[in-house]
């Protein structure tokens, strides 16, 4: 759970806006959290995007995608929301000053990780990857490509490890398939168990958890 630090205008509005995930397990778990706290959420229809908190007319509930919740908190159009910390850190440049993390909820857990082909047997750390990137550019005349939906997190992490001689390729889904399709040499994506990465012959360097 997180909220925007810019709450000064809440009292000028009639409603406190709570943004929660609009579908799937995240929606179900979000509803369960509030229900257990004695604050059940009432959605306007199974597919509606508006709702309310039972017994509290000052709270307006809005059902949006997890990614959009981060953007809503950043712009101040939602005051509290349930979303992933990875999305918050990716979407909000001044994350530490703009957002207050209230509590981890224990569901939807996953890490943002660097993943490389299993065949790169000599690459076990990010320093190794930095060396490979330099060698790749010298040999092929172009930079090693990294497919990801997390451009900001990836840029910062790679720079901290001296592996910034890479080209980011924007991914719109199924990022784990980019190396096998030839769209990229490595990826940065979320992973909870590593099973999907393993199924695509990818692995995480020892220090590759962002």
What does each model-identified segment do?
Residues 1-11:
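Single conserved hydrophobic/aromatic residue that forms the stacking wall/gate
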Residues 9-210:
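Domain-level signature for soluble enzymes in the chorismate/prephenate branch of the shikimate pathway
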